[in-house]
From Swiss-Prot:
The gene is gpbp1. This is Vasculin. GO terms for cellular component: nucleus. InterPro entries: Vasculin_fam. The keyword Magnesium does not apply. GO terms for molecular function: DNA binding; RNA binding.
Length: 375
């Protein structure tokens, strides 16, 4: 036993020899009672002054004297054995059987805890799938996603490369931001698209890319408004509009017509895609843009009923010198008439006021003469 802080320095407790016999205890209750008995015996040995001194010499026992033996009473075990008197070898007598029993109990207790922890984690993963992308990735690897029968990640990446190539060539697939360089598109944008839709999109993108590659840059200009789209026609002659429309639908001729341009823009708005039709280069001035726009305006005016030959129309003819002189004379006469009329009105008003005042004076004189006659 080690020395305690509250014990005096001259008090030494001898340590009993260790024995090779293992203690056989059946449960933890008996083990706890054994511990309490050991503690009681140690306290009794510590506080009794008669045990610590030799009766003949009157000094405390040294470490070289006979070692003190301690007797402890053990309770009855489950097997029905009678209490035995045994010698304690250590202050904490743990048996091998009790240790194995405690280890089994702890393993049995930890197992349901581990299962509960795993179940709780699974619930969290299912409820908050965005916080656990690894679980979602593993789950999607078994389920059919964009392709109905995915073979491997390599094959899926090769198929996506074909789609991305068509997207980079054509800008008609809006709604999906195209990054610069070789940056790949996120897979979540393609999760809700079916296989047939993807095929149609790639087909449209390949047609659009070949169309833009075949067309020269000078024959296009950016259409920034609806008015520009209505007036944007090609330098082709008006007689060959049907041929250009047919060739444009086949994708072989670079010339575009106003009707085809408007139809394509309308279809793209219905699909939710913003087609950048003809917006390739704004730095180069297009050839024949002014003449084509004027021709389109003239054609629209003719369809609305406007007549181009206005030589016989007298209302549109310019004024001659005689007509200008006549106009000036008429305007001067009107101004003079206006001044005369203003002067006449002013004089007439003055005459009316004078006439009224004269009538009032006459009435007053007549009334005064009448009163004088009555008197």
């Amino acid at each position: 036993m080690a020395q305690h802080d509250f014990a005096p320095a001259w008090l030494n407790f001898p340590t009993p020899p260790s024995s090779t016999k293992p203690f056989l205890y059946s449960d933890k209750h008996s083990e706890g009672l054994g511990r309490s008995d050991c503690a009681f015996n140690v306290n009794r040995q510590r506080h009794s002054s008669s045990d610590a001194f030799d009766s003949a010499i009157g000094r405390p026992h040294g470490g070289n004297l006979a070692k003190r033996e301690k007797i402890a009473w053990r309770p009855q075990s489950r097997a029905g054995a009678e209490p035995t008197w045994q010698r304690d070898t250590s202050p904490h007598p743990y048996s091998m059987k009790s240790q194995l029993h405690s280890e089994n109990n702890t393993s049995e207790i930890d197992l349901p805890r581990k299962v509960d922890r795993e179940e709780r984690k699974m619930f969290e993963v299912e409820d908050f799938s965005s916080l656990y992308p690894e679980h979602e990735r593993g789950k999607n690897s078994f389920a059919a996603g964009l392709w109905e029968y995915p073979v491997s990640d390599r094959s899926r990446s090769s198929q996506m490369l074909g789609i991305k190539k068509g997207v980079k060539d054509d800008f008609s697939l809006s709604g999906y931001s195209i990054a610069a360089g070789n940056q790949s598109l996120p897979g979540k944008h393609w999760a809700g698209i079916k296989k047939e839709e993807c095929k149609s999109l790639t087909k449209e993108s390949s047609i659009g890319s070949s169309f833009y590659q075949d067309c020269p840059h000078e024959k296009y200009r950016p259409n920034t408004s609806l008015h520009a789209e209505l007036l944007a026609v090609t330098p082709c002659s008006l007689e060959g509009e049907e041929d250009t429309n047919l060739n444009n639908r086949n994708g072989s001729c670079p010339e575009r017509d106003i009707n085809l341009n408007f139809d394509e823009n309308k279809i793209s708005e219905d699909n939710g895609n913003t087609l950048m039709s003809g917006q390739i280069s704004s730095a180069y001035p297009p050839d024949g843009v002014l003449s084509s726009s004027l021709e389109a305006e003239f054609r629209l005016l003719r369809e609305m009923g406007w007549q181009e030959d206005s030589e016989n129309d007298e209302t549109c003819a310019p004024l001659t010198e005689d007509e200008m002189k006549e106009f000036q004379a008429i305007s001067e006469q009107l101004q003079k008439n206006g001044l005369r009329k203003h002067v006449f009105l002013r004089n007439a008003l003055a005459l009316d006021l004078f006439h009224d005042s004269v009538q009032k004076e006459d009435s007053e004189t007549s009334s005064s003469s009448d009163t004088s006659d009555d008197e």
